[in-house]
C-alpha cells in the first residue's frame, strides 16, 4: 500500500536522523524505488545544483514565443537526416520512456534525461537535449491568451482501437481553457514534423502518451504499433480537427510498462567532475539519501516476499529489521487503509494481493495516471503497420453509431 510505505519511509528517516549513521547494505542497487519519483527528483536536482530556473516553462511568461513550425525547421537544419545510401542506423534494444517534468503542468516539458541506447541510432546526447528544449518551447501557450480562464471542460473520446491480446487503446481529447488548447496544437504539430524529418529517417518514432490504468492487459509492442499507425493515418471530418487538439498521441493501458532503456542525467554526470564545493556537498547528501530510500524499499520487498512464500529458499527476511511498525509491511497496521487509520485495531482479513513475481523481484514499473510520457521506439515494420491498420479498420466497421456521429458532425 503506497500510503503505508510512504509513512514508513518517514518513520525510518526520523529514526535514522536520531541514531548514528550505519552503512547502507544495498549500495549497488540505488534506483529500485518508484521510477517516476526517482527521475523527477534527479531532474529537479539538476536544476537546483545549477541554480537555474527552467528556461522554457510557464514561470517566464514574457519570453518571446516562436512559431513551432519555425522551431521545427531550425532544428531540422541543425540536425539533417543521414545521407541517402549511408549505413543503416542501429535499433533500440528497448523503448525509451521519459516522463513529463511535473505532473499537471504540461508546458514544463519532459525530464531532461538521455538514453545512451539512442547513440547507436545516430542521436547523441547533445542532440537529444536540444530536442527536449526545443519541444518544450514549441508547446508553450501564446502570451496573448494568458488572460483566458475558461472553467468549462469536457472530454471527447474517439473510439478505442482493439489490439491483439485485448489491449485497449483510445485517443482522448480534452477541451480545457483556450490557452491549453492552443498550446496542444503547437506541440502536436511540432512532433509530427520532427518525426518525419528527424526520427523516421533514423528508424525511430516518437510519440507522447498518457495511460488509462483501468485496462487489465499489459501494454505490448502491438499497442505501440497501433498508436503509431493512428498518428500517421490521414484524418478526415471531425477526426482531422480533434487530432490537432490532443496534447498526446494516444491514451493506452494498463498499469505496467514494458521494460525500458536506462536513462542518464547529463547535468549530474557533468557535475561529478566539475561541481564547486557547494554543489558537491548537495550531490553527496542526495546520493546518501537515495541509497537510504533504495535500502528501505528493498527491505520491504524482502519482508513481503518472505511472508507470502515462507517455504521458498528465496524467502530470506531482511538482514536489518524495521525501527517502526509503520515501516514493516507485514504488520497488521499496514495491510489496508482502514487498518492503517485505526492503528491495526480493525484487522485486514482479505488475501494478499500479489505485487512481486515468483522470484521475489520488484514488480514491473507502474504507469502513473495523469502523467504524460514521451516514448521513442523503433519504427514498426510495414507488416506491423498493416496489421495495426487492419485492426482499426475492422473495429471501425463494428462501430456504426460512432462513425455516423463523426459524419454528421463533419457535415455540420
UniProtKB/Swiss-Prot annotation:
* Compositionally biased residues, Polar residues: 395-404
In its keyword annotation, does this UniProt entry include Phosphoprotein? no
This protein's pathway: Mycotoxin biosynthesis
Which keywords are on file for this protein? Antibiotic biosynthesis
Disordered: region residues: 1-66, 308-342, 386-412
Q: Which GO terms describe its biological process?
A: antibiotic biosynthetic process
InterPro entries found in the cross-reference section: Burnettramic_acid_biosynth
Disulfide bond positions: none
UniProt lists compositionally biased (Acidic residues) regions at: 36-58
Q: Briefly, what is this protein's role?
A: Part of the gene cluster that mediates the biosynthesis of burnettramic acids, an unusual class of bolaamphiphilic pyrrolizidinediones that display potent antibacterial, antifungal, and cytotoxic activities. The first step of the biosynthesis of burnettramic acids is the hydroxylation of proline by the proline hydroxylase buaE to generate 4-hydroxyproline. The PKS-NRPS buaA and trans-enoyl reductase buaC construct the highly reduced polyketide chain, and the condensation (C) domain of buaA then catalyzes the amide bond formation with the activated 4-hydroxyproline.
What protein is this chain from? Burnettramic acids biosynthesis cluster protein E
Native source organism of the sequence: Petromyces alliaceus
Amino acid at each position: 500500500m503506497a500510503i503505508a510505505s510512504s509513512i514508513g519511509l518517514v518513520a525510518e528517516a526520523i529514526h535514522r536522523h536520531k541514531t548514528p549513521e550505519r552503512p547502507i547494505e544495498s549500495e549497488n542497487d540505488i534506483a529500485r524505488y518508484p521510477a517516476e519519483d526517482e527521475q523527477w527528483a534527479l531532474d529537479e536536482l539538476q536544476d537546483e545544483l545549477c541554480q537555474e530556473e527552467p528556461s522554457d516553462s510557464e514561470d517566464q511568461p514574457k519570453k518571446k514565443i516562436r512559431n513551432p513550425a519555425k522551431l521545427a525547421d531550425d532544428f531540422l537544419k541543425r540536425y539533417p537526416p543521414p545521407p541517402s545510401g549511408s549505413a543503416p542506423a542501429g535499433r533500440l534494444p528497448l523503448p525509451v520512456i521519459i516522463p513529463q517534468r511535473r505532473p499537471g503542468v504540461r508546458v514544463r516539458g519532459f525530464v531532461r534525461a538521455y538514453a545512451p541506447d539512442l547513440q547507436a541510432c545516430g542521436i547523441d546526447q547533445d542532440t537529444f537535449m536540444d530536442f527536449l528544449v526545443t519541444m518544450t518551447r514549441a508547446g508553450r501557450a501564446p502570451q496573448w491568451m494568458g488572460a483566458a480562464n475558461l472553467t468549462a471542460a469536457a472530454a471527447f473520446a474517439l473510439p478505442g482501437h482493439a489490439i491483439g491480446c485485448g489491449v485497449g487503446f483510445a485517443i482522448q481529447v480534452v477541451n480545457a481553457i483556450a490557452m491549453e488548447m492552443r498550446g496542444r496544437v503547437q506541440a502536436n504539430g511540432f512532433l509530427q514534423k520532427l518525426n518525419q524529418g528527424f526520427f523516421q529517417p533514423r528508424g525511430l518514432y516518437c510519440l507522447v502518451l498518457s495511460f488509462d490504468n483501468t485496462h487489465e492487459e499489459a501494454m505490448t509492442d502491438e499497442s505501440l504499433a497501433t498508436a503509431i499507425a493512428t498518428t500517421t493515418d490521414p484524418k478526415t471530418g471531425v477526426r482531422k480537427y480533434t487530432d490537432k487538439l490532443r496534447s498526446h498521441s494516444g491514451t493506452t493501458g494498463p498499469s505496467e510498462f514494458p521494460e525500458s532503456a536506462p536513462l542518464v542525467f547529463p547535468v549530474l554526470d557533468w557535475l561529478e567532475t566539475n561541481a564547486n564545493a557547494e554543489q558537491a556537498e548537495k550531490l553527496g547528501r542526495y546520493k546518501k539519501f537515495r541509497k537510504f530510500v533504495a535500502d528501505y524499499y528493498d527491505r520491504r520487498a524482502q519482508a513481503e516476499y518472505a511472508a507470502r512464500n515462507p517455504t521458498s529458499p528465496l524467502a530470506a527476511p531482511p538482514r536489518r529489521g524495521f525501527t517502526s511498525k509503520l515501516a514493516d509491511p507485514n504488520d497488521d497496521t499496514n495491510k489496508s487503509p482502514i487498518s492503517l487509520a485505526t492503528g491495526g485495531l480493525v484487522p485486514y482479513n482479505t488475501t494478499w494481493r500479489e505485487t512481486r513475481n515468483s522470484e521475489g523481484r520488484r514488480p514491473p514499473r507502474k504507469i502513473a495516471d495523469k502523467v504524460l510520457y514521451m516514448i521513442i521506439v523503433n519504427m514498426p515494420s510495414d507488416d506491423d503497420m498493416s496489421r495495426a491498420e487492419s485492426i482499426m479498420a475492422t473495429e471501425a466497421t463494428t462501430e456504426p453509431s460512432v462513425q455516423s456521429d463523426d459524419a454528421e458532425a463533419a457535415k455540420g
